[in-house]
Regions:
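N-terminal "domain-start" segment that seeds a small globular fold
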Residues: 1-14, 125-128
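Hydrophobic beta-strand positions
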Residues: 1-2, 24, 105
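Short acidic-hydrophobic, aromatic-tinged amphipathic segments that line or gate anion-handling sites
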Residues: 2-4, 80-85, 116-117
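Short active-site neighborhood of thiol/selenol oxidoreductases, capturing the structured segment around
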Residues: 10-39, 55-59
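Structural microenvironment flanking redox-active thiols in thiol-disulfide oxidoreductases
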Residues: 33-73, 87-93
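Short, internal strand/loop/helix patches
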Residues: 69-104, 108-109
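Non-catalytic, surface beta->alpha helical segment in thiol-disulfide oxidoreductase systems
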Residues: 98-132
Length: 132
């Protein structure tokens, strides 16, 4: 479960797209900014987002909501920008986050295609090889 700025919640299973890219990030993380820029600059990912085939969930797994809210304008409006209320991800070890940033690529049924990825090129290669 994730929480949006207005307080509304959602789940991964509520995301209706062929693929979901869960991008775990922190507001003051330089590497996170680089990866965000690479996702935005990727012709493949941009086209898939535009076509509704890929949804990006930018998920902040920590509890400093002041920093997260201040950083929100930097996240593209076409992405879901959310945080983990109560820091359940880390407390309950819902994801094996070895480092931030990290990306998980999920298919339509939310099966994991990539875990702990930190290279946008790797995500592009995986998506490029998937059946249309």
């Amino acid at each position: 479960r994730y929480t949006l700025a207005a307080g509304r919640t959602g789940t991964l299973y509520g995301i209706r797209a062929d693929y979901t890219l869960v991008f775990f990030n922190n507001p003051d993380c330089g590497m996170c900014e680089r990866i965000r820029a690479e996702i935005v600059a990727s012709p493949l990912l941009s086209e898939m987002i535009r076509a509704g085939r890929l949804e990006v969930l930018a998920l902040y797994p920590d509890e400093d909501l002041t920093a997260w809210r201040a950083h929100a304008p930097q996240v593209p409006s076409s992405w879901i920008n959310a945080y983990d209320a109560g820091a359940r991800i880390s407390k309950e070890e819902l994801y094996d986050l070895k480092a931030i940033p990290s990306m998980y690529l999920l298919d339509r049924d939310k099966r994991v295609l990539a875990k702990d990825a930190f290279e946008v090129g790797y995500i592009e290669c995986l998506l490029d090889r998937q059946p249309q």
